[in-house]
Each structure stands twice: as structure tokens, then as C-alpha cells.
Amino acid sequence: MSEQKTEQKTDDQVSFAIKLSDPTFFNEAVKAINEIVEDATFSIDQDGLYFRGMDASHVALIDLISPNQDWEKWEIKNNGNFALRLDQFCKVLNSLKKKESLSLSTEGGSILHIKTPSMQMNVRTIETSSIDCPLPKISYNSLFSISGNELSRIIKQVQSVSEYIKIVTLDRLVEFSGRGDNGDVKINLEKGDPYLIEIDNRESSEAVYSLEYLQAFIKHTKSHVFTIEYSKKMPMRIETKLDHNTRVHFYLAPRVEN
């Protein structure tokens, strides 16, 4: 993937008050992001909340778009950025009661105020990062949509013998396979299978990807449907809709085999 450039800056102008009646989808998104970065700079404006970041090895990239329509309250005084240590923020989100409302606010960006019906917490933000992290511009030849729970099951099966997963798509078939010192495995899903929701091939494709990164991403969002696009030896693009309009896109570079 392309190089990622980071320029440190301090944003002391951002000011907002937003609320979710059920923060489940936001919790899932933050946990998925935390799998590839330790610190995250979020952008917020009148239209929504955004994040885009790449892991240190430049193997995986996550792009989050959460429009204001998915939030119960959306009051933005000043657009801007705010950055958090995600380990700390995830601990806060994990402590929430199931479907307990969540309010986030800040005046100036240095402190994030977190409020639920039973708790109030103030968390100091960290220095924000302005990141040049363009999305890969790729024309994909193969697309399929799959149940997240089924994809999670397939990944676990392939992980039992390999650190990588090979994906092959034909006209009506998606084949997942792995091979290692202890054996090999192959799983096929054909058009018409209830877990294979959609398949569309411009031409047959084949590529190999890291199971470590795939598993890390989907384990927090596996209750959703994944739409996967890829081409021969090209980065994979996964889209999952977490709420009515909130989407996460995950890009994963292929393993280059000799």
C-alpha cells in the first residue's frame, strides 16, 4: 500500500455534543480500529464522524464513515479533529451496560466528556495527527457477500493449518483454502448457499491474504454481512454496514508469493 505521511498538530478548536441511544455499532467500529492502530484521530463535522488509518506495517487500512443520521443527537459548534488512546477508550466502552446510551462532547478538544445514564467521565485527548492516507484506487474483478459468522468460521478452520488464506472465485463458486506443515484445508461456497449472499465475477480471481489481519478485523463485526472485493494479487476491500448508514471499509494487502 502507499506510504503514509504523518504531521503532528494540535487542534484546540473542535467543539461538539453528540449522542447514541445504542452505541453498539460505534463500539464495534472502535474495537476494529484498535486492532490496527493504538491511537486514533477522528474527524467530525456537520455531516458525520470519520476515521482513516493504516497499521505500522502498511498492510491494513480502515476507513470509517458514520453519518449524523445514525446518531440521536448531533450538535457541532466547530468542525475539527480529536485523538484518543484506543486501549483506554475501549475499556470505557466495554464497561457500558448493554444498549446504554452514550454521549460524547468537548469544548476545545483537550478533554473528551463521556456520559451515560449512570456515569460521567472526562478523558484527556492526545495530540492529533494529520495523516495522508489515500484509499487504494483499484478496479476489482471479483465480488462476493458473505455472512460474517460464516466467514469467521471459515477463518478458524483455515487457521488450524495455516497463517494465510487463499481465496479463489470462479463463476458460481468461492473457494477458501490453506496449507501448512500440519496439513491443508479447503472450503467451498457455491451460488445458492444461504451464507453466500451474492457473487459477481468479471473474471476469475485468486489471491492470498494474512489470516491474522482478517481475524482481527472481523471478530468485532462478525454479526454483520461482509462484501468482499478483490482481484488477482491485489489488495482486498471489505465493506460492512454497522448501522443504517455507518460503514467500515477494510483494505488488506495480499501476500506476495514467489
For the regions a protein language model found, what residue spans apply to each?
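DNA polymerase sliding clamps and clamp-related checkpoint/processivity subunits
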Residues: M1-N34, D39-S160, V168-N258
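Polyanion-binding surfaces on beta-sheet-dominated domains and ring/shell assemblies
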Residues: I165
